[in-house]
UniProtKB/Swiss-Prot annotation:
Endoplasmic reticulum recorded as keyword: yes
Keywords for the protein's UniProt record, in alphabetical order: Endoplasmic reticulum, Leukotriene biosynthesis, Membrane, Nucleus, Transmembrane, Transmembrane helix
Gene Ontology biological process: cellular response to calcium ion; leukotriene biosynthetic process; leukotriene production involved in inflammatory response; lipoxygenase pathway; positive regulation of acute inflammatory response; protein homotrimerization
Protein encoded by which gene: Alox5ap
Subcellular location: Nucleus membrane; Endoplasmic reticulum membrane
Lumenal side: 1-8, 78-80, 129-161
Family designation: Belongs to the MAPEG family.
Protein name: Arachidonate 5-lipoxygenase-activating protein
Transmembrane segments annotated in the record for this chain: 9-30, 53-77, 81-102, 116-128
Length: 161
C-alpha cells in the first residue's frame, strides 16, 4: 500500500483499534459479572451489578457504529488529526461513562453529555468535508485549508467540560 495513503489514515486506524480493545474490555467485564453470578453459563438477567454492567455495555455498543462512521468520515473528508484527537477523547469519555454507570447512574451523565458533544463535532467536521467537496465540484473553490485550520483550532476546546 502507498505510504502516503497509509499516512492519511494511520491515526484513524489507531483510534479504531484502541476502540476495539475497549469493546473487548467492556465485554470481558460483562462476562466476569455473569460468571460471578451464575457459574459457567451466560445469563442476560440477574443481580443489580450484572444489570448495570450489561446495560452500560449495551449502551456503548449501540453508539459504536455511529462513532466509527463519523470518525472515519471526518478524518477522510476533513482532517485526520483533529478527528483522531476527538476520537481519543470519545474513548476516554466512553470509559468514564461505563465506569460511572457501574456506580451511581448520575456519575455516568457527564460522560454521556460529553460524548454527545464529541459525536456532534465529528459530524460537523464530516459535513464541512462534504460541503467543501461540492464547493470544489460546482464552483472550483477549495476551502480545505480554512476548514482544517478551524477544526484544528476548535478540537482542543473539546477538553472543556
Amino acid at each position: 500500500m502507498d505510504q502516503e495513503a497509509v499516512g492519511n489514515v494511520v491515526l484513524l486506524a489507531i483510534v479504531t483499534l484502541i476502540s476495539v480493545v475497549q469493546n473487548a474490555f467492556f465485554a470481558h467485564k460483562v462476562e466476569l459479572e455473569s460468571k460471578a453470578q451464575s457459574g459457567r453459563s451466560f445469563q442476560r438477567t440477574g443481580t443489580l451489578a450484572f444489570e448495570r454492567v450489561y446495560t452500560a455495555n449495551q449502551n456503548c455498543v449501540d453508539a459504536y457504529p455511529t462513532f466509527l462512521v463519523v470518525l472515519w468520515t471526518a478524518g477522510l473528508l476533513c482532517s485526520q488529526v483533529p478527528a483522531a484527537f476527538a476520537g481519543l477523547m470519545y474513548l476516554f469519555v466512553r470509559q468514564k461513562y461505563f465506569v460511572g454507570y457501574l456506580g451511581e447512574r448520575t456519575q455516568s451523565t457527564p460522560g454521556y453529555i460529553f460524548g454527545k458533544r464529541i459525536i456532534l463535532f465529528l459530524f460537523l467536521m464530516s459535513l464541512a468535508g462534504i460541503l467543501n467537496h461540492y464547493l470544489i465540484f460546482f464552483f472550483g473553490s477549495d476551502f480545505e485549508n480554512y476548514i482544517r485550520t478551524i477544526t484544528t483550532t476548535i478540537s482542543p476546546l473539546l477538553l472543556i467540560p
